[in-house]
A protein has these predicted regions:
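Terminal and linker regions of secretory-pathway proteins
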Residues: 2-446
Length: 446
């Protein structure tokens, strides 16, 4: 199951840049980047942290506010297998591609006005192993790479990272997760909680975690898509009611003898199958490309290239001690060796809501990959007390989405929808998401 973003990097040109960034020692300060004029107006550090036999590569952007007191965030991106650069350039980092220069030999970079690094220091991690520049010197480590193994490794990663960055030891610490990283974030957070309890050093000043468009429970997410499609006007009320009766609310694991249900699901698929499920209002690029006059030839070329590429990546997956080929989302991780050993992360959220930390969960209301319906359903299962009932929240006098807050003791869980956003919200509504984060991190209501 791939939770990679539909937005792709300009691979050829940026591979060259990434190789430049990748030629680092354990830590390197990057002061300039191709495509950006002059010195970077923020501190960017790249490097490796060794965890057992694995080398985790990271991009660290120091807060542009007060780095010695501002929050420190470890961000896990989705896929699994998508590089932390996705978060840095596409979501909450201080730089983005200038789309007006995409036809140039080298695309330009521009500063982002709503970067979360204005008020927080962020570690963008390449994880699990095999993602981005992260690698292992032992082939066995790729075989055992899994949800729980990755979370355990990243719990060790952050303590070792802090050992080399002791000036951030006292900063309030948060784990962030996006898309499939939303499943990993609470598992990583629990690793940190348990490590603190066990007296591991350095102690991590954990204050909370947040997840955006979080993959949490496959059954809930898949079964929510049909009610979501009806609610968004994508299927008729007649078809929806008929499918509810024939499938009895279970749309994922349908018995092959239930022909009425299968027929209804086929009709629903006809209505929704060609949508861009990451944002239902956006074009489905796989249908619009390549250009019509080169359609057959281009499609055949793409299919052949992808076939060769996937075989090449799989056969050379055990290359040890280096990263010979960089890709934004490594299919050899997503569809190959990675073990999906956590079917539902709800239990981790239940555990964490009993601890002394705060939580932010947000979704895009036009996301059909992980619908807001499924997220609201598992939040309800946590049996928390509503502290601030469902209401609109605003940015610049306009409704930015809807929110409600749950409370347990003095610590709270804030849930928010982001109006008009897809999967993931920070890619579509940067100003709104920045405002949401700024209020939450400073303990203000949305």
């Amino acid at each position: 199951m791939a939770f990679a973003s539909s937005i792709q990097f300009c691979s050829l040109q940026w591979l060259l840049i990434l190789l430049c960034l990748g030629n680092t020692f354990s830590q390197s300060i990057v002061k300039t980047l191709p495509g950006f004029s002059g010195l970077l107006p923020f501190k960017l550090e790249t490097g490796y942290v060794n965890v057992e036999r694995s080398e985790f590569f990271y991009y660290f952007v120091e807060s542009q506010g007060n780095p010695l007191t501002d929050p420190l965030i470890l961000l896990q991106i989705g896929g699994p297998g998508c590089t932390g650069l996705t978060g840095l350039f596409n979501q909450i980092g201080p730089l983005a591609f200038d789309s007006s220069t995409y036809q140039a030999a080298l695309p330009s970079l521009k500063l982002v006005p709503n970067s979360w690094t204005q008020i927080a220091s962020i570690i963008f991690i390449d994880a699990p192993i095999g993602t981005g520049f992260s690698y292992s010197t032992c082939a066995e480590d790729y075989i055992v790479s899994s949800d729980t193994n990755t979370a355990s490794m990243l719990g060790k990663f952050i303590r070792k990272w802090l050992e080399g960055h002791l000036r951030f030891k006292a900063n309030p610490f948060f784990v962030g997760g996006d898309s499939y990283g939303g499943l990993l974030a609470p598992i990583i957070t629990r690793e940190i909680v348990e490590g603190n309890k066990a007296g591991l050093e350095p102690f991590i000043n954990l204050e909370g975690y947040y997840v955006g468009s979080p993959h949490t429970d496959t059954n809930l997410e898949e079964n929510s898509k049909i009610p979501y499609a009806y609610g968004m006007g994508l299927i008729s009320s007649r078809l929806f009611e008929r499918a509810k009766r024939s499938c009895k609310g279970e749309y994922l694991n349908v018995e092959p003898t239930n022909l009425k249900c299968l027929e209804d699901l086929a009709k629903i698929s006809e209505c929704t199958g060609n949508l861009n499920i990451h944002h239902i209002l956006r074009p489905n690029c796989s249908l619009s490309l390549p250009m019509p006059n080169k359609d057959k030839q281009a499609r055949r070329s793409i299919e052949e290239t992808n076939s060769r590429y996937n075989r090449h990546r799989y056969l050379n997956f055990w290359c040890k001690g280096t990263v010979t080929e960089w890709t934004r989302c490594n299919d050899s991780v997503t569809y190959g060796s990675y073990i999906y050993d956590v079917e539902s992360a709800i239990g981790y959220h239940k555990y964490l809501t009993d601890t002394r930390i705060k939580v932010l969960i947000y979704t895009g209301d036009h996301d059909m990959r992980v619908t807001h319906i499924s997220t609201e359903e598992w939040i309800k299962s946590l049996n928390l007390t509503i502290d601030d009932d469902w209401r609109a929240w605003y940015i610049n006098g306009q409704i930015a989405g809807y929110t409600e807050t749950y409370k347990k003791s003095k610590y709270s869980l804030t849930y928010a929808t982001v109006k008009g956003a897809g999967h993931s919200p920070t890619e579509y509504k940067k100003a709104e998401c920045y405002g949401m984060f700024e209020r939450w991190i400073n303990n203000y209501p949305l």
